[in-house]
C-alpha cells in the first residue's frame, strides 16, 4: 500500500460559505502531478489528544500543486490547520 504525508491547508471555501467537513490537503510528494493516484484513498489525522479523524480523498483541487480535497467525518477542528495527515492509497499494489 502506498502512503503519503500531507499538510492541512484549511477548509474548502466559497465566497460566502465555508465547508468544515472538506479539508484541503497538500500532499508532500516528489512529483505533485501524482496526487491524482490518491483519489478515493483514506486519510487519517491524529490530534495531540490522541483523537483520530478519518476521511476520504474526494478529488484534486487545481491542476497542479498536489492539493486534494478530503472529506472528514467528523469534521476536522480549526486547530488542525497546518497539521500532518497520513494518506493511504486505495486499491491494490498500484
UniProtKB/Swiss-Prot annotation:
HAMAP family: Ribosomal_eL33. Pfam families: Ribosomal_L35Ae. It comes from Aeropyrum pernix (strain ATCC 700893 / DSM 11879 / JCM 9820 / NBRC 100138 / K1). Belongs to the eukaryotic ribosomal protein eL33 family. Keywords: Ribonucleoprotein, Ribosomal protein. It comes from the Archaea. InterPro entries: Ribosomal_eL33, Ribosomal_eL33_sf, Transl_B-barrel_sf. This is Large ribosomal subunit protein eL33. GO terms for cellular component: ribonucleoprotein complex; ribosome. GO terms for molecular function: structural constituent of ribosome. The keyword Hydrolase does not apply. One of its GO terms (biological process) is translation.
Amino acid at each position: 500500500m502506498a502512503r503519503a504525508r500531507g499538510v492541512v491547508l484549511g477548509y474548502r471555501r466559497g465566497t460566502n460559505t465555508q465547508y468544515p467537513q472538506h479539508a484541503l490537503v497538500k500532499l508532500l510528494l516528489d512529483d505533485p502531478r501524482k496526487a491524482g493516484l490518491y483519489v478515493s484513498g483514506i486519510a487519517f489525522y491524529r490530534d495531540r489528544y490522541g483523537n483520530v479523524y478519518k476521511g476520504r480523498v474526494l478529488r484534486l483541487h487545481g491542476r497542479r500543486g498536489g492539493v486534494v480535497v478530503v472529506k472528514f467525518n467528523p469534521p476536522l477542528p480549526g486547530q488542525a490547520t497546518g497539521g500532518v495527515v497520513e494518506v493511504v492509497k486505495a486499491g491494490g499494489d498500484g
